[in-house]
Amino acid sequence: MMTLIWYPKCSTCQKAKKKLEELGASFETRDIVTQTPTAEELREWIRRGGLELRQLYNVSGRLYKELNMKERRLQMSEDEQLDLLSRNGMLIKRPLLVWEDGVLAGYREAAYEAAVKA
């Protein structure tokens, strides 16, 4: 089973959900604000998805800019960054698609199609 971690008001997240439905994928949704991922979940997803920590940041988000995260994160340890992300779901890139064998950060139609077919 896949989990789509999303912000329901986000148009890109809505597109991702619609694509999963069109593909007939078995998935559940999780609101990134009300059920923010834990630091340990984020650490595991980085490993599982072959991601870099920086790829989990919502760099176009208002909060990222308000907190000057482009510069600030460079002064923070990985643990500090994961803790901050786990307390502020709006800092996390969305949607996140999580399944047993992988993780996708952001929405790319072809990547979603490949993940569902795998």
For each of these PLM feature ranges, what is it?
Residues 34-118:
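Thiol/selenol-based redox catalytic cores and closely related redox-interacting motifs
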Residues 1-23, 27-32:
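Local sequence-structure signature of Cys/Sec-based thiol-disulfide redox active-site neighborhoods
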